[in-house]
């Protein structure tokens, strides 16, 4: 069961396109829903991702970021799939190791609920997704304590329900469409603070130091590497080795 005491239902669809449509429909009816995918499968979800983001539905797509096949098949890790989704309206959160996946996946779900912005939560395919490593597992009571239940209730109250008829999926002309599209800007402006708030709560519980951006190395460094994903742990080890 999840933190709400509900048995989780798992549905296998015919394709990633069908999975994205099922996630969208499930969210529209007030069920907190998530999915997992990678590579070409993620690309099939893009049309629904635009709708999910614009309707401010709090989902998380967990992605083991892998190469999008071009002239040949390649199933190894890179960010070509997730970068193809940057303009969908999904917030993006990356992890560098398996413990971060455990901790920051929770941040993605909690921030999506409170911030009303869906998340694309990703980590390097194979290098991180298939790593076997000991981790500190979350206690569901701690997760439930951090979850904004008022935001959950608000999400469910605005869901499609025959007892509360509402119109969704209307047609708009250019004079109104752009204004409505811009109206969500405020929630995106507020989102970094929401993510940071939950990172601080995780830090307080686990003794970690998660931030939106973490700096590692000498304060007077002449060269700086800006990176995300599994390369970060490697870079830290190289820094320690060179400064030893």
What are these regions (language model features)?
Residues 212-244:
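Redox- and metal-dependent alpha/beta enzyme cores, enriched for Fe-S-associated oxidoreductases
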Residues 1-84, 90-113:
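Thiamine diphosphate
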Residues 45, 71, 130-132, 234-236:
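Short helix/loop capping segments that flank catalytic or ligand/cofactor-binding pockets
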Residues 66-67, 123-130, 229-231:
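Glycine-rich beta-alpha junction loops
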Residues 2-6, 62-63, 85-89, 178-197, ...:
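Gly-rich Lys/Arg/Thr-decorated short loops/hinges at beta-loop-alpha junctions or inter-strand turns
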Residues 50-52, 109-111, 136-139, 237-243:
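Short, solvent-exposed amphipathic alpha-helical segments in soluble enzyme
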Residues 119-215:
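Conformationally flexible catalytic loops at phosphate/diphosphate-handling active centers
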């Amino acid at each position: 069961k999840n933190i709400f005491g509900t048995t989780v239902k798992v549905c296998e669809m015919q394709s990633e396109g069908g999975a994205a449509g099922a996630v969208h429909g499930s969210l529209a009816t007030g069920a907190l829903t998530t999915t997992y995918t990678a590579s070409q499968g993620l690309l099939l979800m893009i049309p629904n991702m635009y709708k999910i983001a614009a309707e401010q539905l709090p989902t998380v797509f967990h992605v083991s970021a892998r190469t999008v096949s071009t002239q040949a098949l390649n199933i190894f890790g890179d960010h070509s799939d997730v970068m193809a989704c940057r303009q969908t309206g999904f917030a993006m959160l990356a992890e560098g190791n398996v413990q971060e996946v455990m901790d920051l996946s929770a941040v993605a779900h909690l921030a999506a609920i409170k911030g009303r912005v869906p998340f694309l939560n990703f980590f390097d395919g194979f290098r991180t997704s298939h790593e076997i490593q000991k981790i500190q597992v979350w206690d569901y009571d701690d997760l439930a304590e951090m979850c904004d239940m008022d935001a959950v209730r608000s999400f469910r109250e605005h869901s499609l329900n025959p007892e509360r008829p509402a119109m969704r999926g209307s047609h708009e002309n250019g004079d109104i469409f752009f204004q409505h599209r811009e109206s969500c800007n405020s929630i995106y402006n507020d989102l970094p603070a929401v993510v940071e708030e939950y990172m601080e709560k995780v830090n307080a519980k686990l003794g970690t130091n998660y931030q939106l951006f973490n700096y590692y190395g000498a304060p007077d460094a002449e060269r700086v590497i800006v990176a995300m994903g599994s390369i970060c742990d490697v870079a830290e080890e190289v820094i320690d080795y060179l400064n030893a």
